[in-house]
Design a protein with these regions (language model features):
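Tubulin/FtsZ superfamily GTPase core signature
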Residues: 1-359
Length: 359
C-alpha cells in the first residue's frame, strides 16, 4: 500500500474582529475572499452581530449589556470580554496565529480587544494587533480612549499595526463620501491581514514558512512597518522595493527596524538579479544590522508586475509610549499599505491589482 506523504500542515490562522469596526473589517475580508484564515466576530451588540458574515460569532457580556452594546465605554467592553473569557479561549485554542482587529476609540473594541489578545498570547498563539485610530473629527474623548486602548493592547500582542484614519485620507479623493472613506479604512485593515497571511499560506519559489514569520514577529511588542509596493517595466524591482518602504501613510521608516521579512512576487520571468536588486534596496534603506528573511513566489495574474511585501519589526517603543501621555493626531502611528503617489493605481499583491482593474 502506498501512503501519501505529508510535508507539514498549514498554520491555523484566525482573525478576530472585535466591536463594530472589527466586525466591518471582517465582513470586508470575507467579501474579498481572503483565504487561509478563519473569521471570528465578537460584539456586545446583538443586532450588529447578526449582520456579521463570519462563520463564528460570539455575543459577549450578555448579562452586563443585555445585548445593547457598550455605550462607547471601554470599561464595559473589557468587563464584557471577561464575562466570556472561557468561551473566547475555546474559540482560539489550537491556533498558531491570531489577528485581533478593531476600531479603537469606542467601547467594545477598545475594551475587549486587549482581553482577547491577552487570552491569545496565554494560549501560545502568535498574536498580531491590527487596529485603527479615529478620525480627528470624532473628538478628543474618542481619541484619548483610542490611545489608551492601543497601549493596553500593545502589552498583549507580539506585533502591532496601527492605522490612523486621518492618514487614509491621503490616499482617497477629498470628495469621497463618508461611507466610502470608512470602507477604505476597512480595506486597509483587510490588506494588512491578507498580506501577512498569504506569505505563510501560499506556496512560493522560495518559501517563507510560519517559523520565519514567528521569529520576526514574536515577542517584539512594537508597532510594525508593513509596506506593499508594485513595480512595472525595466526598473520594476527598484520601483516596487522603494514603494514598499515609502508610503503616504507611513510615519516610521525601515531604518529603525531590527528584523524584517521581504517577499517578492512576480510572473515566471522574475530573475535572480531582480531579487538581488530588491534586497539591496531594502538593505540600503535599513539598519546595517537588520536581520532579513526573504522569500519569492509566482503569480501568473501579474502580467509583468513585480510586487514587494515588507514586514519590519523591532522598533524602539519609547516615543510611542509618550504619545499616550500627550494625545495628538500628528504623533500618530505607522502603516502599511499604499497607493501609487503618482496616480490612482493601488500598489499591492495581485488581489489588490485585480480589485482595481474590476472598477
Amino acid at each position: 500500500m502506498v501512503e501519501q506523504e505529508t510535508f507539514g500542515e498549514k498554520p491555523i490562522i484566525k482573525v478576530v474582529g472585535v466591536g463594530g469596526g472589527g466586525g466591518n473589517a471582517i465582513n470586508r475580508m470575507i467579501e474579498n475572499d481572503v483565504k487561509g484564515v478563519d473569521f471570528i466576530s465578537i460584539n456586545t451588540d446583538s443586532q450588529v452581530l447578526r449582520l456579521s458574515k463570519s462563520e463564528y460569532r460570539m455575543q459577549i457580556g450578555k448579562q452586563l449589556t443585555k445585548g445593547l452594546g457598550a455605550g462607547a465605554d471601554p470599561s464595559v467592553g473589557e468587563q464584557a470580554a471577561l464575562e466570556n473569557e472561557e468561551e473566547i479561549k475555546d474559540l482560539l485554542r489550537g491556533s498558531d496565529m491570531v489577528f485581533v482587529t478593531c476600531g479603537m476609540g469606542g467601547g467594545t473594541g477598545t475594551g475587549a480587544a486587549p482581553v482577547v489578545a491577552k487570552i491569545s498570547k496565554e494560549l501560545g498563539c502568535l498574536t498580531v494587533g491590527i487596529v485603527t485610530k479615529p478620525f480627528t473629527f470624532e473628538g478628543k474623548k474618542r481619541m484619548r480612549q483610542a490611545l489608551e486602548g492601543i497601549e493596553k493592547l500593545r502589552q498583549h500582542v507580539d506585533t502591532l499595526i496601527v492605522i490612523p484614519n486621518d492618514k487614509v485620507l491621503n490616499i482617497i479623493d477629498p470628495k469621497t463620501s463618508m461611507l466610502e472613506a470608512f470602507k477604505e479604512v476597512d480595506h486597509v485593515l483587510r490588506r494588512a491581514v491578507q498580506g501577512i497571511a498569504e506569505i505563510v499560506t501560499v506556496p512560493g519559489l522560495i518559501n517563507v514558512d510560519f517559523a520565519d514569520v514567528r521569529a520576526v514577529m514574536k515577542g517584539k511588542g512594537t508597532t510594525a512597518l508593513m509596506g506593499i509596493g508594485i513595480g512595472q517595466g525595466e526598473n520594476r524591482a527598484v520601483e516596487a522595493a522603494r514603494k514598499a518602504i515609502c508610503s503616504p501613510l507611513l510615519e516610521i521608516d525601515i531604518n529603525g527596524a531590527t528584523n524584517a521579512i521581504v517577499f517578492v512576487t512576480s510572473d515566471v520571468d522574475i530573475s535572480f538579479d531582480e531579487v538581488n536588486t530588491v534586497m539591496n534596496e531594502i538593505r540600503s534603506a535599513s539598519n546595517s544590522e537588520i536581520d532579513i528573511v526573504y522569500g519569492a513566489g509566482f503569480n501568473m495574474d501579474l502580467r509583468g508586475e513585480l510586487i514587494v511585501t515588507v514586514i519590519a519589526t523591532g522598533y524602539d517603543n519609547k516615543d510611542e509610549t509618550e504619545e499616550v501621555a500627550t494625545p495628538s493626531v500628528s504623533n500618530g502611528e505607522k502603516v502599511v499599505v499604499q497607493k501609487n503617489p503618482s496616480d490612482d493605481t493601488p500598489v499591492g499583491p495581485s488581489w489588490l491589482i485585480n480589485e482595481f482593474k474590476k472598477k
